[in-house]
């Protein structure tokens, strides 16, 4: 054959033939075909059906690179790292291969959206393990080290101007999408909106304005406040209890949003009898 020194595994998913090729020196890749197949199934069923007849993932002395229907990945001996890079390069089949956003201008629409979907895929693949149960919050754990006051840059900057592309291109936009999904819109409304974005802009070239407009129209919420904070500025979340007053036997808690970022508010309450309660107030409480 053309590559006699490579091992070849094959499987399929709904008419798509899935190939993995790897060197004998990378026996860990025996699981790779399953990783590709389960990732392709997840992305297809959760977001947008994979439209091509083949998908090939090849192991080699590379960092990771994607092309239509073929990806190149490093050996990555650690199982979690291997699954992540395989699923990440696979995810690029959706962005920017199917939905052709301009990664040279807006990496957050490419690497960021892809990081968002592949973290969710990793959580599913490793479900029930400490890694699977925590991987989606990985970008949040990076926040303190990368969102440094006076140094952090807005996502909207061109990548050539970025001093921390790992944060502005990959991790912060993934955190942004997670926050929009789990905290602002809710999972059902977000998923319906993002699926429609992928469907509407498949084989086209959306700009940020196209994405904003579609998410607004499908979700039914004006999200300008959200995009302004996350993409056009480096706003921070700073919610506070301003004061507590007693009136008519009841206590009133006065809250304020002191930062430039507007999000729902979560508050723990302790009552006179010692019982506690955690309440979440929706983002609309700030009278957007």
Residue ranges and their predicted role:
Residues 15-17, 49-55, 91, 172, ...:
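Loop/turn elements at helix/coil->beta-strand transitions in domains of secreted/extracellular proteins
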Residues 25-30, 102-104, 160-167, 197-202:
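Active-site rim elements
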């Amino acid at each position: 054959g053309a590559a006699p020194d490579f091992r070849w595994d094959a499987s399929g998913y709904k008419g798509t033939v899935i190939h993995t090729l790897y060197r004998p020196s990378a026996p860990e890749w025996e699981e790779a075909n399953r990783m590709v197949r389960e990732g392709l199934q997840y992305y297809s069923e959760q977001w947008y059906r994979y439209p091509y007849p083949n998908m090939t993932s090849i192991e080699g002395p590379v960092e990771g690179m994607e092309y239509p229907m073929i990806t190149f990945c490093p050996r990555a001996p650690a199982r979690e790292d291997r699954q992540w890079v395989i699923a990440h390069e696979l995810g690029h089949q959706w962005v920017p291969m199917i939905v052709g956003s301009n990664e040279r201008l807006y990496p957050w629409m490419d690497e960021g959206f892809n990081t968002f979907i592949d973290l969710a895929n990793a959580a599913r693949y490793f479900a029930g393990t400490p890694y699977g149960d925590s991987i989606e919050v990985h970008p949040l754990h990076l926040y303190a080290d990368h969102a440094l006051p006076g140094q952090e840059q807005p996502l909207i900057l061109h990548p050539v101007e970025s001093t921390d592309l790992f944060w502005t291109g990959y991790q912060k936009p993934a955190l942004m999408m997670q926050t929009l999904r789990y905290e602002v819109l809710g999972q059902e409304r977000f998923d319906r909106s993002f699926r429609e974005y992928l469907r509407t802009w498949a084989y086209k070239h959306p700009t940020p304005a196209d994405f904003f407009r579609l998410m607004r129209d499908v979700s039914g919420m004006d999200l300008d406040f959200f995009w302004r904070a996350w993409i056009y500025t480096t706003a921070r979340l700073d919610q506070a209890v301003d004061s507590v007053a007693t009136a008519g036997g009841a206590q009133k808690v006065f809250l304020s949003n002191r930062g430039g970022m507007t999000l729902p508010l979560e508050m723990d309450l302790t009552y006179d009898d010692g019982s506690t309660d955690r309440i979440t107030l929706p983002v609309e409480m700030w009278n957007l």
